[in-house]
Amino acid sequence: MRVALGVSYNGQAYNGWQSQPSANTVQDRLEAALGRFATQEVHTICAGRTDAGVHGLMQVVHFDTELQRAPFSWVRGTNTFLPADIAVQWAQPVPDAFHSRACAVARRYAYVLLQSPVRPSVDAGRVGWVFHALDEQAMHKAVQHLLGEHDFTSFRASACQAKSPVKTLHRIDITRRAPPAGESTGTHGCVPCYWRFEFEGNAFLHHMIRNIMGCIVAIGQGLYPPEWMRTVLEARSRDAAAPTFSPDGLYFQGPVYGAEWGLPTRTAAYDWLP
């Protein structure tokens, strides 16, 4: 039988999702826990690999097994052997035709950014950080140039193994969580607040969102006009873009599947995310 799992994790301690020789990865920890619960080797396939330091709110994986277990037994049993920063949220039997990666029609990511004169402490490792005020209107204008199907070579890491740099971005939303009423403007007019950037696309290149974030922040700080984003995109050269932004605030929200698979979506447990 084939089983799908929804998995969440804090990526700070891991060298990304994908299993690597002599490396501490989320996939290695998950498969080790599944193996201990199932008392047999288990191999998983995920919906989307994440880089070192990147978090997962609802990674979806599937695996094949001969064991017959109730869905919640897979949840409880696997979590027993997982470290505290990884958790299986749900388990569900799926048809053999289901494939966590191939059946996903889209993928969603969020980047959470703290704007503050002082670096994050409690949120360290869970949010990105800027100490300059960002121009919301300029950032909104800039990301419009990225919507649709494009060659995203300028935002692709040199180590990217994707066959094609052409991807489609369906949506980029930018929201700001305002500070409490009456709060001071802080240093140099930098009002402490959280920014949330949400991306939805058919697929993403290695470091693509972090490279886009570097450009968005540069434009938000007034270093470049919004039109610079199109210039970078059309250059089709990594050298044209801003430096890769920190992985700390990047979250894989999860894949999007057709209703025919009947899989759970993002859980209310993460409504706290700024």
From Swiss-Prot:
Active site: D51 (nucleophile)
Superkingdom assignment: Bacteria
InterPro entries assigned: PsdUridine_synth_cat_dom_sf (IPR020103), PsdUridine_synth_TruA (IPR001406), PsdUridine_synth_TruA_a/b_dom (IPR020097), PsdUridine_synth_TruA_C (IPR020095), TruA/RsuA/RluB/E/F_N (IPR020094)
Class of the enzyme per the UniProt entry, highest EC level: isomerase
The EC number(s) this enzyme carries: 5.4.99.12
One GO MF term attached to the UniProt entry: RNA binding
UniProt keyword list: Isomerase, tRNA processing
Amino acids binding substrate: Y109
Catalytic activity: uridine(38/39/40) in tRNA = pseudouridine(38/39/40) in tRNA
GO BP term, example: tRNA pseudouridine synthesis
One of the Pfam families matching this protein, by short name: PseudoU_synth_1
NCBIfam families named in the record: hisT_truA
Subunit structure: Homodimer.
Function statement: Formation of pseudouridine at positions 38, 39 and 40 in the anticodon stem and loop of transfer RNAs.
Family: Belongs to the tRNA pseudouridine synthase TruA family.
Protein name: tRNA pseudouridine synthase A
Natural source organism: Acidovorax sp. (strain JS42)
